[in-house]
Amino acid sequence: MENKINKFIYWTPRILSIIFILFLAVFSLDVFDENLGFWGTILGLFMHNIPVFILAIVLWISWKREIVGGIIFTLAGLLYVAIMVVNMLKNQFQLYMVSWNFIVAGPAFLIGILFIINWLKKRKNEKAVVAPK
């Protein structure tokens, strides 16, 4: 039973990260509606996917160092919430902006928390191996 829980805690943040990164990449497809030409479209895709590239690199690092994923995904969620709050203060507040926070920042927070739980569990297991009872 413990082994199944360990596998679940290990794989869940990684799989959710991949799904979340692909979800964010879908938002860049709106650049094709702009009729920018070939190079303009390439530049637009690159600009829209900068967060995707950053999170993909973070996932790659986090595969072995879970604390990095825990911190960065949590900070990414906080950054998105902060950007949305600034936008809400600048523009007129609209209720749909709050739902965007749940849709984008919520999974980032969840992934960050799962990476931290995985890191803590891994640390606990390493200490148990070093100092047997």
List the model feature ranges, each with a label:
Residues 42-52, 98-106:
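Alpha-helical transmembrane segments of polytopic membrane proteins
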